Design a protein with these regions (language model features):
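Conserved catalytic core of nucleotide-sugar-dependent glycosyltransferases
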Residues: 2-73, 80
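C-terminal catalytic/acceptor-binding lobe
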Residues: 66-205
Length: 205
């Protein structure tokens, strides 16, 4: 996509509701082109590319906290507070895989001295805080989080379906025009490029 209209699409959809306080775009590598996904998921975790309602800060009830899984923790607290989230699949973000870029948590949390793929990064050989990540989230939400193993590594597991029965509240003055609004975007065929090996990148986490 070569336009910022995707942000406007997500913002306008989120603004249809009074109680959707958190939304964002899914990762492109979680939605490969050969798979089918709904345009959005309701009441689930939102990672990295996040739109937050300012009033959750003004009220003082929701804020960033902790060192690990901050976005998952905040997503859970939003939903447990009676609010709603949307994770968009119609619009995706091309997040760089964890540990492949310096800065952020690469050094402080993951212990990586030189960012890169799993084949050429430096440092962190004995560093695997995955269980600590999972235990930290479990301590914050023992009612919702299970510690499990997936693909031979420690992970947290959350059943988000418990939050998905209640529908968000549309604004009383909401008027959605008939027809399709493409926000000025056009679908065009681009020149062939060499795509990233998505599954290879997923393996670096």
């Amino acid at each position: 996509m070569t336009t910022p209209a995707c942000f406007r699409v997500c913002e306008d959809f989120t603004d249809r509701y009074t109680d959707v306080k958190m939304s964002g775009m899914n990762y492109a590598f979680f939605c490969p082109a050969f798979t089918k996904r709904p345009p959005y998921y309701h009441n689930t975790r939102v990672y990295s590319c996040i739109l937050l309602s300012n009033d959750i800060y003004e009220s003082g009830e929701l804020y960033w906290r902790g060192k690990f899984n901050e976005d998952t923790d905040l997503s859970l607290r939003v939903m447990k507070g009676g609010y709603h989230t949307y994770l968009f699949c119609a619009m995706l973000c091309g997040k760089v895989a964890t540990l492949t870029m310096k800065g952020g948590n690469t050094k402080e949390v993951y212990g990586i001295d030189q960012a890169g793929t799993k084949h050429d990064r430096v440092g962190g050989e004995d560093f695997d805080h995955r269980r600590e990540f999972a235990e930290s989230l479990h301590a914050q939400h023992p009612d919702e989080v299970r510690i499990t193993q997936k693909w031979g590594r420690w992970h947290h597991h959350i059943d988000y379906t418990v939050f998905q029965n209640k529908k968000p509240t549309k604004k009383p003055d909401l008027n959605i025009p008939k027809g399709t609004n493409n926000y000025g975007m056009k679908l065009v065929k681009l020149k062939s490029t060499t795509p990233l090996d998505e599954y290879e990148e997923l393996n670096v986490e």
